Amino acid sequence: MTTQVVNVIGAGLAGSEAAYQIAKRGVQVRLYEMRPVRQTPAHHTDKFAELVCSNSLRANTLTNAVGVIKEEMRLMDSVIIRAADECSVPAGGALAVDRHEFAAKVTEYVKNHPNVTVMNEEITDIPEGPTIIATGPLTSPDLSAKLKELTGEDYFYFYDAAAPIVEKDSIDMNKVYLKSRYDKGEAAYLNCPMTEEEFDRFYEALIAAETVPLKEFEKEIFFEGCMPVEVMASRGRQTLVFGPMKPVGLEDPKTGKTPYAVVQLRQDDAAGTLYNIVGFQTHLKWGPQKEVLQLIPGLENAEIVRYGVMHRNTFINSPNLLRPTYQYKQRDDLFFAGQMTGVEGYVESAASGLLAGINAARLVQGEEPVVLPPVTAMGSMANYITATNAKNFQPMNANFGLFAPLEKKIKKKVERNEAYAARALETIRNFVNI
């Protein structure tokens, strides 16, 4: 057994998973959790892996990417998924848990491991020696300041302002056209043209749609220079036509005329399977958001892989800062995990902790850190946060659009997703003993 100790800062989903993975590999862990000494605005207990929002870990089927990532984690002996399975409550095809039992179970498994020492204190500086930072979206101000100092002001963010992302295969290509404004450079945008009548229908639905209520600690985010599309719309219908939906320079090649308004879609991934809706950061609830977006010509049947969000979320610019091993590029023994890395969601956060934990243990044991291939769900997430365009980087949930493309194109969605899942699970089995 190595005498080196790994520091894990934060006992949320990612930190708890990381600590467990390190400990089970025979490495000592110091797990720092500032609760209950200092609470966050969202937490209510001193338990590890407290679920502060929904009690659902989302889909549990293999036709959904988050279901695949769960199955990969089961094969890799994830403490988070084991506890979730043991504390599950009826939820149809989803995995939902009794949140109190779940947090208690994770706390018990991690705290009682002989290689884990729990330190209930706030960390305000980045420790020397092997360390995983998994402090989550509500990282304390003092540590945030140190992380900002470490990563550089331009690479450290305090809130999400993400536009929705759709699957290219679900866009009606007969209704959209490829063009850049004024034909500058290569044709890089898919354009969804609107008549005045279509715009009016869209506008009325947008301003009437229900928004997510802001929590007290989130109320400052709209003053940071990034405004939700529905707030812009509330200032008058022309605000959008002269803003994110301006049609000038975007003549429709089919008619030769300039539409009344245009919604632009920009490629979001290297493979060209995902497109984001430009300028559509939003605080709409997901149900109404889908209804509004499907009023856009060409997006009537759009598959939304990430909904637009605006919320408090401390995260780093991982493409500039991290390797797909979750190591910090400038310091081999420093790892990041959880939502701070730009993975979005309970399961994705835990999965990043699993891989960061495995790699931290391997590092102190003198072994090479592991990069999971992007044909796996966990590997595709690590690849997304480290290889995507750094300039427009925003957090992302697991989705099949991030997976490496299949060798053979499969038209039917369910069959295609099953093929992604089968390939992922076949591949991950090669890594279960690392």
UniProtKB/Swiss-Prot annotation:
Keywords: Cytoplasm, FAD, Flavoprotein, Methyltransferase, NAD, NADP, Transferase, tRNA processing. GO terms for biological process: tRNA methylation; tRNA wobble uridine modification. Coiled coil: none annotated. Its EC number is 2.1.1.74. Pfam families: GIDA. It comes from the Bacteria. PROSITE patterns: GIDA_2. FAD binds at residues 10-15. It is found in: Cytoplasm. Its main location: cytoplasm. It catalyses: uridine(54) in tRNA + (6R)-5,10-methylene-5,6,7,8-tetrahydrofolate + NADH + H(+) = 5-methyluridine(54) in tRNA + (6S)-5,6,7,8-tetrahydrofolate + NAD(+); uridine(54) in tRNA + (6R)-5,10-methylene-5,6,7,8-tetrahydrofolate + NADPH + H(+) = 5-methyluridine(54) in tRNA + (6S)-5,6,7,8-tetrahydrofolate + NADP(+). GO terms for molecular function: flavin adenine dinucleotide binding; tRNA (uracil(54)-C5)-methyltransferase activity, 5,10-methylenetetrahydrofolate-dependent. Its cofactor is FAD. One of its GO terms (cellular component) is cytosol. NCBIfam families: gid_trmFO, PRK05335.1. Catalyzes the folate-dependent formation of 5-methyl-uridine at position 54 (M-5-U54) in all tRNAs. Belongs to the MnmG family. TrmFO subfamily. This is Methylenetetrahydrofolate--tRNA-(uracil-5-)-methyltransferase TrmFO.
